[in-house]
Amino acid sequence: MMSIKIRVRIAASLTVMALATTLAIAQTPATPASSLDTLVRAEITPFKGKVYLFAKNLDTGAIYSFNGDERVRTASTIKIAVMIEAFTRVAEGRAKWTDELVLTKAARYGGSGVLPELADGLRLTLRDCVNLMMVVSDNTATNMVLDYLTTDAVNARMSALGYKNTRIMRRIGGGGESKEGKEPDNKRFGLGATTPHEMVQILEKLEAGEIVNKPAAKEMIDLMKREQARYAIGRTIPDVPMASKYGALDRLRSCVAIVYSKHGKIAIAITVDEMPAVIWSVDNPGYLLMSRLAIALLEGLQSAQ
């Protein structure tokens, strides 16, 4: 017969093993079912181009990643970092929202926005330029803000916040290169670089009120809710509230957003790049793919609750 001492030791060992298993489960963020991965890969596999994405249910901690830690070109999503530096500068008392910025030929750049249609010499407040940068993705307004803040200051802010991958390399259209932008290895990124994972981390901190301060973070989220373009993540859910920023370059499309859906608050960052054709249309295949992926992510991450 098994001795009492042996039985006690076995029972103690089993108790420790059970406790360790319980702790491991408790400390591991919820992950989506394999069905979500199957749906995502079914969309991505036939797509002509490269796809990078990261998503997180901010209520449950459930995550999904596909190349989410790969560094990618940002296009206009880097404007989120510029916005954060502007709000921080004002909060620190080193800038005022009423500070005037002057529209010049050097700042002028087309592609999106309204300022390229207006005359040089126009004076706008810092507040106006930041609003234009985020709501209508005005490239000229962005350059005006960057001339005021500097690209190096934006990057220093990202470093201070712990974001090592998110960097702006230069002004839109060229000039104003940051220190990182002058590095040969970074030339391939053009305007800016980030990872989908890091963009979701930034969104999560903004939503939690942990960037600058709670009132400023809320104001930034509210500003992103006013973005007028819903070409990608919010394309097929027009009535669902969303705080977002999209971006477009030649063969690239990107979008980062917090979707305030019935499934919970889902933060999503998607970049598609190296598409075979340059298509300047709201029906760009990249936008269409992102809209389908967003629906799968919203439903799949909700199922992990």
Q: What residues fall within each predicted segment?
A:
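A short, well-structured edge-of-sheet supersecondary motif
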Residues: S35-G68, I266
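Active-site SXXK
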Residues: G61, R73-L101, I268
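Acidic helix-start/capping segments at beta-turn-to-alpha-helix junctions
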Residues: L58, W97-V114, L149-T150, R171-G176, ...
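Bacterial N-terminal signal peptides that target proteins for export
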Residues: M2-T15
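Structured C-terminal helix/loop/strand segments within mature extracytoplasmic catalytic/sensor domains
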Residues: Q27-E43, Y148, V200-I237, P241, ...
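Mid-domain, small-residue-enriched loop/turn segments at the edges of structured enzyme/sensor domains
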Residues: K50, L122, V130, N143-L203
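Second-shell loop/turn segments in exported
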Residues: T28-A30, S65-R73, G113-D120, D128-L132, ...
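Active-site-proximal loop and beta-strand segments within enzyme catalytic domains
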Residues: T88-R127, N131
